[in-house]
């Protein structure tokens, strides 16, 4: 069982649900390691965006409020930081602020940047899992540390009915591991 293969299988599983849509930078075109996990996803399920992380997270919330399930892809935590306002003040709070009236389902995919074979410098290898866990009450953050963790975590994120959204954290250094 390979890390990359399990990610690809998980994306294909998510894509099989008619409500899912994949959104982010380099989802419809090559550009990141995550792009390679989407190569077999139908183009009509991929929404390519410019570099505008806060807008992307806001769009994800809007899609979720319209009964879609966005799979919002931020290749690294360091990019996701630019969407923290939407994540912490809106997505995490919308169910509470609406007295349970709105409970969107949003799947957020991010990663800890790879350090090998080339270290991209420290602004690309952050892991903000613990900080986000402390700031959010209705978002579960799951680190995908082993290949066998991947499919069950993505399946849980799609099937959950506990009004929680999910951030799944991948490890860039594991993409090429056997």
Where are these regions (language model features)?
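Thiamine diphosphate
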Residues: 1-178
């Amino acid at each position: 069982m390979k890390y990359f293969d399990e990610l690809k299988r998980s994306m294909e599983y998510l894509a099989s649900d008619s409500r899912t849509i994949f959104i982010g930078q380099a989802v419809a075109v090559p550009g990141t390691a995550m792009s390679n996990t989407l190569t077999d996803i139908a183009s009509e399920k991929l929404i390519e965006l410019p570099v505008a992380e806060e807008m992307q997270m806001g769009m994800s919330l809007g899609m979720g409020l319209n009964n879609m399930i966005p799979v919002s892809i931020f290749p690294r935590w360091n990019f996701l930081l630019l969407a923290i306002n939407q994540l912490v003040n809106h997505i995490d709070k919308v169910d509470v602020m609406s007295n349970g009236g709105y409970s969107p389902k949003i799947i957020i995919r991010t990663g800890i940047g790879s350090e090998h074979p080339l270290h991209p410098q420290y602004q690309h290898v952050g892991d903000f899992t613990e900080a986000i866990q402390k700031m959010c009450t209705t978002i579960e953050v799951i680190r995908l540390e082993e290949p066998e963790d991947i499919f069950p975590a993505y399946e849980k994120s799609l099937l959950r009915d506990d009004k929680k959204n999910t951030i799944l954290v991948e490890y860039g250094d594991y993409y090429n591991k056997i």
